[in-house]
Amino acid sequence: MNENKNNPWEEIALDEYEAHMSLDSVKQLQAMDSIMKEQFEAYPADTAMVLGVAGGNGLRHVRREKYRTVCGVDINEGYLRKTAERYTGLSGVLECLRIDLINEAEKLPAAKLVIANLLIEYIGYDAFQRAVLQTGAEYVSCVIQINTDESKWVSDSPYLHAFDRLDEVHHQIEETALTAAMAEIGYTGILQKTKPLPNGKALLRLDFKADRNTR
């Protein structure tokens, strides 16, 4: 990506992004909401971080009795403002942080659980490794998209124009390579779960736990 340009995600309007993700032919927003309910409940963590939080989809499943702090991280300031507006009921628990994960991973606070859904595709393995290590997370739960046609990784929709620049930052993420990248930094895979989507794509959830001998 040209260093003089801002990140494409800073230009995508949240309403267009969410409208695209909610289409009957896409249904990723709905699928992600149900996945995040499971992610928040899966492990004995009282602090969590959602990387690429966007408009806060899935945060309705955060239970105040379980979590002391949940950090929502995104590069788009407007997304974070909307998230804070939507989840006033999580006041005192939810913290929204504008951080460029590729260049500013050192700004991330600690968290026991890191959730990264459809995020690694836009920062790559190396930046994700740095982010995870910075948080010192015990558990990492990720979702990546499996594409039947890798040349069409954004589903057709009336909002397709909004995503024109994403090719600049998109990486095709593979399960084996992600598992290897996590092993490099001391994490072992503990869960694999696939959720089919209506457009021939699928969401693959991969969870990892920090190796005791590396912490």
Residue positions per predicted region:
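A short SAM/SAH-binding and catalytic strip from SAM-dependent methyltransferases
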Residues: 112-126
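Conserved acidic residues
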Residues: 46, 112, 138
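Core SAM-dependent methyltransferase catalytic element
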Residues: 191-215
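Conserved beta-strand signature within the Rossmann-like core of class I S-adenosyl-L-methionine
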Residues: 136-151
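Class I SAM-dependent methyltransferase Rossmann-like catalytic core
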Residues: 1-43
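Class I SAM-dependent methyltransferase SAM/SAH-binding core
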Residues: 47-104
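Short alpha-helix
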Residues: 166-186
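Short, glycine-/aromatic-enriched active-site segment of Class I SAM-dependent methyltransferases
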Residues: 147-169
